[in-house]
Each structure stands twice: as structure tokens, then as C-alpha cells.
């Protein structure tokens, strides 16, 4: 067959199909058991055939980010401050929002701060700062007493180099290349690259329990923010003074 899939590609396709099938079965079983199911409005999850559908979750079993509209696992801007729209934080500083658009808005602002103040311009530099080794989003995979300072959850260890590779590959750059996300006044230069960065971070921080993780070498991303929510986040950002 002239255009036959490579063994690695077939394996990746099978893995994604199995993930989607198991997720669908879990969702069906939860519904049959009468478990409460919520839809993460504005968050889409990749299906086995490559399409995207709204992400549905059980709030009693979901990671912190889904339960608290903080899909990017952003922390408060400092020890006592709050981002616009932030309603609180957990003991590790991860923010809670009533509206996920505010979390995405805050993430975009933070990316601009990284570029403007710290000259973090590549996927590698950005994610090493945003996701330091050993940190995590606080997903409930370990009881609080067993989590180390800063999060400490097994299922969702941050892996900045892997996430940086996913971002770079998805936009056709190397992990150390300048993403050129913002102009000198903070205007967004490349919305496609910024959105890929957001989606890769969401995929990593929400975790494999709800977002399929692409195998090494693959350029697809498991969860993405839909157009409406992204546009609302940008609008919220442009309304802010300064």
C-alpha cells in the first residue's frame, strides 16, 4: 500500500482510539450510576477520529483546574493579590475563577509579563518559568497530607520540555525559537501560536485523566479552548487599564 501508516503512527492512532473509547465508556457508566456530570463550557477534548467535542467531567473526581475553572493551573500574581475575576485560591496558591475566560485572560497577561520583563520568548523559556520542575496543578490524585509543597500530585507532574516540544512542533518551530507572541506594546502578534501555547498548557495541566496526551513525536494536542472563550478572554484583557 503506497501510503500505508508507519508502525508508530498506527500505534498512536490505536492509543488515541482506546483513550476516547475508555473515556466514553466511563462517561456512560457515570451517567448510569447517577453521578453528577458537568460540561466545561468552552473546553473541547479530542476524540478518536480527530474531531473535538465538549469536555464532560464528574466534579467529585475531576482535577482542581476543571472544578475551579482554572484549566491552565495559574497561580495568583503574588502571595496576597488576585487576578481579575479570581475568587480565591487553594493552599498551594492555584487560583479559583467563576469564569474560565478570566483564567485564560490572566494567562495571556502573564505571558506578556514573561516576555516584557524576563525576555522569555521561546516555548522552552516560557514553560520552564511557568511550570518549574516538580510543580503540578494540584489534581486530586494524592491526599493533601501526602502532597509535597507546591502541589505534588503523581498524575500530573509538569514536564516543561515535553510541553515546549508539543507547542513548537504544532506551530512548525523549534522549542528554542522565538514565538514572537507580542509586540512592544503588548499587542498579540501571532494568535495562532498563543492559542497553541494555551492549548498545550491546558492539555498538560488538566492531565491525562481528561485530556489525551499525544505520544512523543506527534503534533496534535488533546484539549483546546474554543473560539468563543478565547475571544472573550482577549476582550477581557483589552478592557483592563494599563
PLM regions with names:
Residues 11-20:
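Bacterial N-terminal signal peptides
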Residues 2-12:
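Bacterial N-terminal signal peptides that target proteins for export
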Residues 7-9, 22-25:
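Intrinsically disordered, low-complexity serine/threonine-rich segments
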Residues 26-242:
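Cell-wall polysaccharide-cleaving catalytic domain and substrate-binding groove, primarily
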